[in-house]
Amino acid sequence: MTVDSKPQLQRLAADADVDRMCRLLEEDGAFILKGLLPFDVVESFNRELDVQMAIPPPKGERLLADKYPPHFKYVPNVATTCPTFRNTILINPVIHAICEAYFQRTGDYWLSAAFLREIESGMPAQPFHRDDATHPLMHYQPLEAPPISLSVIFPLTEFTEENGATEVILGSHRWTEVGTPERDQAVLATMDPGDVLIVRQRVVHAGGGNRTTAGKPRRVVLAYFNSVQLTPFETYRTMPREMVESMTVLGQRMLGWRTMKPSDPNIVGINLIDDKRLENVLQLKAADSPA
């Protein structure tokens, strides 16, 4: 793929100005944050994911995993199984500064899903697509509608052209349809572990093919933050109560354990019980608010 002749993904420091990040989302549709996650966080997260990868797949119905080819491994629900994700990555202040600005027209937001994909050698490139398959409503939004979904891509191994770094078509969030783009319209999101790729709703992108013949698979965790007006793809309501109460208030909000507030004219919120706040009815404690 020839990438030198076209504008590339902007790469920002993790402490860059949030207004600049949001401008890039509106102008380009995506950008990379360099070194957002420290090495020890990435290392801890990878160890926890190694444990999950070693568990034999459950018997019975697997609605999504069974649709993947054999050289594509999938681990769902990392918010429940990986403490590093739910207690550190999920509440990262930079990610939430971006989300608060990004979702300001639609109100509160929460996590829709977070799962691991491990892509081994021989996996072909994905077709170009938008991240709207879980909630087809997004496909019918007019271009001028405020965004209601944000994709956050965490590389946990190196992303290179050879092992299938994500391919992003800058500015494609302004297209009316995905169509059939050529691969050379995209730019490569080559990244190191700890970097993060932030992708605006409607941006056309694809995972590249893994053309390596040896070495580790490409490992990535995909997290999707949606307006609370959309039902999450994964539910976290089956998490043990003691696990939930070990989290911060923000973490609990992201996983649907507290009442949330869309934008006006909604005046009371959603996720209510008997016209009361969910957390009050449950008498829910939190790590940063025990009483």
Curated annotation (Swiss-Prot):
<dbReference type="GO" id="GO:1902181">
    <property type="term" value="P:verruculogen biosynthetic process"/>
</dbReference>
<keyword id="KW-0017">Alkaloid metabolism</keyword>
<comment type="subunit">
    <text>Homodimer.</text>
</comment>
<comment type="function">
    <text>Verruculogen synthase; part of the gene cluster that mediates the biosynthesis of fumitremorgins, indole alkaloids that carry not only intriguing chemical structures, but also interesting biological and pharmacological activities. The biosynthesis of fumitremorgin-type alkaloids begins by condensation of the two amino acids L-tryptophan and L-proline to brevianamide F, catalyzed by the non-ribosomal peptide synthetase ftmA. Brevianamide F is then prenylated by the prenyltransferase ftmPT1/ftmB in the presence of dimethylallyl diphosphate, resulting in the formation of tryprostatin B.</text>
</comment>
<keyword id="KW-0223">Dioxygenase</keyword>
<dbReference type="Pfam" id="PF05721">
    <property type="entry name" value="PhyH"/>
</dbReference>
<comment type="similarity">
    <text>Belongs to the PhyH family.</text>
</comment>
<keyword id="KW-0843">Virulence</keyword>
<keyword id="KW-0560">Oxidoreductase</keyword>
<feature type="active site">
    <location>
        <position position="68"/>
    </location>
</feature>
<protein>
    <recommendedName>
        <fullName>Verruculogen synthase</fullName>
        <ecNumber>1.14.11.38</ecNumber>
    </recommendedName>
</protein>
<keyword id="KW-0408">Iron</keyword>
<comment type="pathway">
    <text>Mycotoxin biosynthesis.</text>
</comment>
<dbReference type="GO" id="GO:0051213">
    <property type="term" value="F:dioxygenase activity"/>
</dbReference>
<dbReference type="InterPro" id="IPR008775">
    <property type="entry name" value="Phytyl_CoA_dOase-like"/>
</dbReference>
